[in-house]
From Swiss-Prot:
Glycans are attached at N103, N112, N154, N228. Microinjection of cer1 into blastomeres results in the formation of ectopic heads that contain cyclopic eyes as well as duplicated internal organs such as liver and heart. The heart beats at a rhythm different to that of the primary heart. Based on this phenotype the name 'cerberus' was chosen after a mythological guardian dog with multiple heads. Residues 1-20 form the signal peptide. A component of the Nieuwkoop signaling center in the blastula. Expressed transiently in a broad anterior domain of the gastrula, including the anterior endoderm of the Spemann's organizer and more laterally the cardiac primordia. Expression is excluded from the prospective prechordal plate region and the ring of cells that give rise to the trunk-tail mesoderm. This is Cerberus.
């Protein structure tokens, strides 16, 4: 009998203790902090129903940069029961930066670096252009002084052999129309000589002759073309059919101009 009474008393005491602890647990909320190893540590005794923001300045994680960081977790409702409360999920914890000094310094360094690259490239290009422009400007200035002051007899002028020997005598195709009065017009395909050849003039010479070269036909044929006319007589035209052209040199007297005879009965059309 006494044993039964003792058992009942012990059960009543245990029930009272559990009810008190349970009511105490409802008023209290669990707070969590982050230790140096990155694990959550549960702390009791806080009166607020939310997860405290923990300063993680001392963390040595590789993904954490400069500045102070905080951890934000979901708020826990204080009306939940003890069995429904759960530990905060790490997937729902977000890491954010509260100080932007590191980002500002990085942006400032990138801006200064880009400015240095731009100015150094511009200065380098400017030096290169100055180096390439100096010889041309110097030659132009020397030629200007020679023309203004008069070149002395012993002055030597530099010239490139490639520019002197460069000739451009080309054979260009064109359409030639051969016409005559009271005759039908005839159209043929021919070539003409066009280009630049070398000419040499030496002053104060006794013979006063110039050595000139002209772009002339070097290979050609003479064709006799008969025109269809209304009269009883047929008209025959002799036309030079040009195949190749070259620069040919010849000597001429001073102030003598070359004379070119052109048949008025032929017209040129490119």
């Amino acid at each position: 009998m006494l044993l039964n009474v003792l058992r009942i008393c012990i059960i009543v005491c245990l029930v009272n203790d559990g009810a008190g602890k349970h009511s105490e647990g409802r008023e209290r909320t669990k707070t969590y902090s982050l230790n140096s190893r990155g694990y959550f540590r549960k702390e009791r005794g806080a009166r607020r129903s939310k997860i405290l923001l923990v300063n993680t300045k001392g963390l040595d994680e590789p993904h954490i940069g400069h500045g102070d960081f905080g951890l934000v977790a979901e708020l826990f409702d204080s009306t939940r029961t003890h069995t429904n409360r759960k530990e905060p999920d790490m997937n729902k914890v977000k890491l954010f930066s509260t100080v932007a000094h590191g980002n500002k310094s990085a942006r400032r360094k990138a801006y200064n670096g880009s400015r240095r690259n731009i100015f150094s490239r511009r200065s380098f290009d400017k030096r290169n252009t100055e180096v390439t422009e100096k010889p041309g400007a110097k030659m132009f200035w020397n030629n200007f002084l020679v023309k203004m002051n008069g070149a002395p007899q012993n002055t030597s002028h530099g010239s490139k052999a490639q520019e002197i020997m460069k000739e451009a005598c080309k054979t260009l195709p064109f359409t030639q129309n051969i016409v005559h009065e009271n005759c039908d017009r005839m159209v043929i395909q021919n070539n003409l000589c066009f280009g630049k050849c070398i000419s040499l003039h030496v002053p104060n010479q006794q013979d006063r002759r110039n050595t000139c070269s002209h772009c002339l036909p070097s290979k050609f044929t003479l064709n006799h073309l008969t025109l269809n006319c209304t009269g009883s007589k047929n008209v025959v035209k002799v036309v030079m059919m040009v195949e190749e052209c070259t620069c040919e040199a010849h000597k001429s007297n001073f102030h003598q101009t070359a004379q070119f005879n052109m048949d008025t009965s032929t017209t040129l059309h490119h």
